[in-house]
Amino acid sequence: MAKRSTTRRRPGRKPAFRRPAVQAAVAGLRYIESSALLAALLEHDASVLAALQADGRYVTSSLTFAEAARAIIRARVAGRLAVAMEQGAVRGLRTFERRCFIVDVTSAVLARAGRPFPVEPVRTLDAVHLATAELLAEPPQLVTIVTRDARVRDNARALGYSVE
C-alpha cells in the first residue's frame, strides 16, 4: 500500500479531516473502530490483522487514538501487559495513525451521536464512532466497519454498512 502524505493543520483552521479528503475515496473505505484496533494491538486478533492488511482506504475517528492509548496504559497498570508489549502496542498504534485518514470529532459528529440509533442502547463513545462513519459522505454500501463491539456491529448493520 502506498504511503499517504500527511498534511498539517494551519493555525486557525479546523478541518473535519486531517488527512487527504475522505470524500475522494470511492470504494474500499474501511472504518476501523477502536475495539478492533485494540484487538489487533493487544490480542493479535488474526481476523482484525487481516482486515488491517486488506486493500482499501482506512479511516477512523481521532477518538480512536485516545481510547487505544488509554486502554494500553490500563492494561500495563493492571499487569496484563509487560513493558515490552506496551511499547510494541504503542508502535503499532503510531504506525496505524500514519496509514489512515483521521476524522476529527466535530460538532456535527457530536450532534449526530446525540440522536437515536436503530439499535439502542448505544454508549456515547460507540455513538461517536457510528456518527463519524455516517458523516463520511459515502454510501454505506461502500464502507466496511471493522469492529469487535456488538453494539457498534448491530447498529452498523442496521444502518446498511458491511461489518468485519
Predicted regions: what is each one?
Residues 17, 99-151:
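Active-site neighborhoods of divalent-metal-dependent phosphate/nucleic-acid chemistry enzymes
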Residues 32, 162-164:
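Short hydrophobic/aromatic-enriched beta-strand-loop microsegments
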Residues 50, 58-60, 73-77, 83-103, ...:
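Anionic, Ser/Thr-rich low-complexity intrinsically disordered regions
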Residues 2-67, 75-88:
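Short, well-structured N-terminal submotif of metal-dependent ribonuclease cores
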Residues 23-24, 51, 95, 115, ...:
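Generic structural signal for beta-strand residues in well-ordered domains
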Residues 69-73, 134:
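Short, amphipathic alpha-helical segments that act as regulatory/interfacial helices
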Residues 41-43, 134, 157:
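Short, function-defining helix-loop hinge/capping sites that tune catalysis or transport
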